[in-house]
Amino acid sequence: MALAAASILFAPAQQQQKVIGFMTDFDVKDDAVGICKAVMDGVAPGVRVIDITHQSEPYNIAMGARFLAGSAPYFPKDAVFVVVIDPGVGSTRKAIIARSRVGQTFVLPDNGLLTLVQDRDGIVEAHEITNPAWMIGSGISSTFHGRDIFSPAGAHAARGDDWTQAGSVLDVSKLVRLDLHNATINTTGLHGQVIGTDGPFGNLVLNVPAETFAQLGYKLDDEVPIDLAGKHYAFPFVKTFSDVPVGKELFYIDSRGRLSLGINQRNFSETYKVGEGADLTIPKK
């Protein structure tokens, strides 16, 4: 799924240490996130860590890839990202550090989390993290690489250490990629998919960029028919939730420039029992 070119990138951080964007699926009910941040501070005292989220759906690499690509443009051009959504922890999957064409650095498992960043920004160089000096030390856990590998490596990069010393160079064309794609249009209309829900609100996020939806010919206030998860509906296309009464459905373009489905002050996903992975078709007008 391609994303629009990043255009919101801020200037490099003014302090010597770089900002770290930290994202996991750990939740915050136990001490895992705090431990990782303590490790970062131990390597790079006073480092500024911005929590992107720690409630990405467990094991959902595609969701993590979407959150990472969506948040990266709002960080400095020299920011470091530590991302731990790692169902393959302790296996043969690689721990990597990579640099985008923009200049941002990513420390994460090689499991597809970089797919959308690579599509939009390009990855110019990547290394496997094998240098013990970039890890927590001896006794690396087989189940907590967030603490033992990714956090210290990210902190080393943030404090300005030469990130190419983290380990052996990798062929960026062979980094693991997810099969993420945008909706397609043919003679019968648009064919797409639900790629997630919008936090606790239950709005459906679709793999339909605004410019793709525009090709169907619908205008604001049009009723848009849709076959969703095998059932047929029609909802108005409007600018925002308040354009329809409370409890009524709507199509709208979300803050990331994607077509979405919602209900004003209600949860669409729960109401219609539809979630990530559901197929959809929208005919041309």
Please provide the spans of the model-predicted regions.
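A conserved acidic, glycine/proline-rich C-terminal tail/linker
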Residues: 205-271
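N-terminal signal-anchor module of multipass membrane proteins
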Residues: 21-28
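Bacterial Sec-dependent signal peptides at the C-terminal "C-region" and cleavage site
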Residues: 3-16
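Active-site histidine-anchored catalytic micro-motif
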Residues: 17-19, 31, 43-49, 59-66, ...
